[in-house]
Amino acid sequence: VHLTAEEKSAVAALWGKVNTDEVGGEALGRLLVVYPWTQRFFDSFGDLSSASAVMSNPKVKAHGKKVFDSFSNGLKHLDNLKGTFASLSELHCDKLHVDPENFKLLGNVLVVVLAHHLGKEFTPQVQSAFQKVVTGVANALAHKYH
């Protein structure tokens, strides 16, 4: 990901204010509600029958935290996202067979959730930087696909 020093600083500063437990669960939950076809990858999560069921599902929250812990780690390695996410890319490609388009959808949902949580601090400049990051992460996760 090609970010200016200013963009890297803004991303790091605002990510430090994010409660990844909360944001991760909310972002994954929103993905499953807004794009219901993504639920097929989460059959073992139990009740995903309604928006309220998804958003209150403890397995969705737990997996969302796991996803965003990995995302947080990626923010420390912006110059090597492909390397950082290589094993996750392989897992999602070879074993889970996740459509790589879903990574882009999740990234866009994350931007919405960050805007909601950060309010006025989520300026257009910060949004632009985060959009570059989520696009870079989505591309890194899609890297192992043929």
Swiss-Prot record:
- Residues bound to heme b: H63, H92
Q: What is this protein called?
A: Hemoglobin subunit beta
Partners and quaternary state? Heterotetramer of two alpha chains and two beta chains.
Q: What GO biological process terms does the UniProt entry carry, in alphabetical order?
A: hydrogen peroxide catabolic process
Which cellular component terms (GO) are annotated to the entry? blood microparticle; haptoglobin-hemoglobin complex; hemoglobin complex
Keyword annotations for this protein, in alphabetical order, are:
Acetylation, Heme, Iron, Metal-binding, Oxygen transport, Phosphoprotein, S-nitrosylation, Transport
One protein family per Pfam: Globin
Report domain Globin positions: 2-146
Q: List residues modified as Phosphoserine.
A: S44
Record flagged with keyword Transport: yes
Q: What family name appears in the similarity comment?
A: Belongs to the globin family.
* Record PTM S-nitrosocysteine, positions in chain: C93
UniProt keyword annotation of Heme present:
yes
What does the entry state regarding organ or tissue expression?
Red blood cells.
**Could you name the domain of life of the organism this protein comes from?**
Eukaryota
Sites where N-acetylvaline occurs are at V1
List modified residues, type N6-acetyllysine: K59, K82, K144
Task: Show the InterPro entries listed in the entry.
Answer: Globin, Globin-like_sf, Globin/Proto, Hemoglobin_b, Hemoglobin_oxygen_transport
Q: Where is the signal peptide?
A: none
The beginning of the lineage is: Eukaryota, Metazoa, Chordata, Craniata, Vertebrata
Q: Which GO terms of the molecular function aspect are on file?
A: haptoglobin binding; heme binding; hemoglobin alpha binding; metal ion binding; organic acid binding; oxygen binding; oxygen carrier activity; peroxidase activity
Q: What does this protein do?
A: Involved in oxygen transport from the lung to the various peripheral tissues.
